Amino acid sequence: MPQYRSRTTTQGRNMAGARALWRATGMKDEDFQKPIIAVVNSFTQFVPGHVHLKDMGQLVAREIEKAGGVAKEFNTIAVDDGIAMGHDGMLYSLPSRDIIADSVEYMVNAHCADAMVCISNCDKITPGMLMAAMRLNIPVVFVSGGPMEAGKTKLAEHGLDLVDAMVIAADSSASDEYVAEIERSACPTCGSCSGMFTANSMNCLTEALGLSLPGNGTVVATHSDRRALFERAGHLIVDLCKDYYERENANVLPRSIGNKAAFENAITLDIAMGGSTNTILHLLAIAQEAELDFTMEDIDRISRYVPQLCKVAPNTQKYHIEDVHRAGGIMSILGELARGNLLNVDCPTVHSPTMADAIAQWDITQTGSAEVAEFYKAGPAGIPTQTAFSQSTRWQSLDGDRADGCIRSVEHAYSKEGGLAVLTGNIAEQGCVVKTAGVDESILVFEGTAYVTESQDQAVADILADKVTAGSVVIVRYEGPKGGPGMQEMLYPTSYIKSKGLGKSCALLTDGRFSGGTSGLSIGHVSPEAAAGGAIGLVKTGDKILIDIPNRSINVLLEDGELEKRRAEQDAKGWKPELPRPRKVSSALKAYALLATSADKGAVRDLKKLESLQ
């Protein structure tokens, strides 16, 4: 029988000192026989998706105590990608994922916690905590802070979000007053940005992985229904703890729940809902922590047969995450996938014996439960606030239209092929990714002329200076995990391309990555990256590039042997993977770059690189 990890510090005469310190935190004699559960919070006043989490940790802690456990809360960092966007702050975003994973490991292992409740929300926090959960492999439940309500203004007929503010700001035809109105209306409440951006995509994927409760990805942060998710998580983690440590049920551990079939479910959901391309990067990294053989090849294979069943901002202006919830949330998308025989329904979850059981209970098209129907009617109030659980607004009806609603059936899919695709070719030999859900059908096959920039800063300046014209393929290189370092998001360049009216006549190709708010012909994660010697570093301005999404290919159109000739010329000059532009890089980022892999490996640390330094 597995032993409670916490007994290392709470049992035996030699642990008198440790117990004395535990007592100083408020523990009493009877507590030393209970499981010690880490409440991993990520509250910060820097991030709207986390600004309301201050009291959530103690809410979960009180429920853990009611269920017979001891709760100990700690905090980890959280970077707001939107605020860090467009300047050197973005260099720190992706590396923060590893710091979050490490900090959770350090705290949980140093204090021998038995289990965790992870309170996450925004872009790198959920994946960082998922990496830690798989690394530690102790019972865990995820509960996120929830999505922001979509913005409302009389000046726009559709819901607003962060991207609207970015795009309109660069539109020279928009008045200062109009820009100010959009800015003030775009992000009205606490919560993760309201579209199917990276944060919400990842929180939705925790449902598909089986590590969170139904509704985790879609109940808006302001709604009173979200309180129950935190409360249930507190009770559930104690049950999972006892299942593992007292009943020897290893099926409740993260690696048992998050097996390869579950990861296939997660990427299937991601493709079906047109999620952020960042999710590919994160799923690859999380799978490596779980020691799973889950690769870009698996993602490419699945992307070829999964249809797009949901279309949400930034891929459309019609729907935001609050609309997905009204249509039945993630459980209803999973239900449609299951009916199309596209889902592994035998996977266990933290709350149900199998995914099939979960779908039967929570899919609004299957269940007859009035309680479930009421749950998915939880909607936005349209009142600006930073307070969680502050409103109880309900939609008058559910959106169960699977032919023309927010969520579609397989038979009525938005497209037969899903919202994400992996492309390969002579400038991306190990692959690159594109969110096809955000690409206009007219440019699924696109031949354009390369316009090469050596940094995001240069790309932004040239786009705003009208140096980029229709028919261009803007290449932004040396922005990968190693080259950046930190693999910056390119939301400003793609937003400015749209501002200039080039959204359907230009492409952007980078070894960096994109915000979940990006749409258009934006292709990222080119691997190998330029700083690792990738062929994207050999492209010259004026080269012709052919992008063929239906055939999953991307190539620079050169005579046979031309790339090899360019590489030989480059090598003859003594080329090294150094930055071809001035950029101040801290020692912390240099350490990250030293071990970072390219995006096709999840941009994780490769400790084998240390061997070459010894």
Swiss-Prot record:
The modification N6-carboxylysine is found at K124. It catalyses: (2R)-2,3-dihydroxy-3-methylbutanoate = 3-methyl-2-oxobutanoate + H2O; (2R,3R)-2,3-dihydroxy-3-methylpentanoate = (S)-3-methyl-2-oxopentanoate + H2O. Binds 1 [2Fe-2S] cluster per subunit. This cluster acts as a Lewis acid cofactor. One of its GO terms (cellular component) is cytosol. GO terms for biological process: isoleucine biosynthetic process; L-valine biosynthetic process. [2Fe-2S] cluster binds at C122, C193. The keyword Iron-sulfur applies. One of its GO terms (molecular function) is magnesium ion binding. The active site is at S515 (proton acceptor). Its EC number is 4.2.1.9. The keyword Translocase does not apply. InterPro entries: Dihydro-acid_dehy_C, DihydroxyA_deHydtase, DiOHA_6PGluconate_deHydtase_CS, ILV_EDD_C, ILV_EDD_N, IlvD/EDD_N. Pfam families: ILV_EDD_C, ILVD_EDD_N. Its cofactor is [2Fe-2S] cluster; Mg(2+). Keywords: 2Fe-2S, Amino-acid biosynthesis, Branched-chain amino acid biosynthesis, Iron, Iron-sulfur, Lyase, Magnesium, Metal-binding. This is Dihydroxy-acid dehydratase. The lineage of its organism: Bacteria, Pseudomonadati, Pseudomonadota, Gammaproteobacteria, Cellvibrionales. The gene is ilvD.
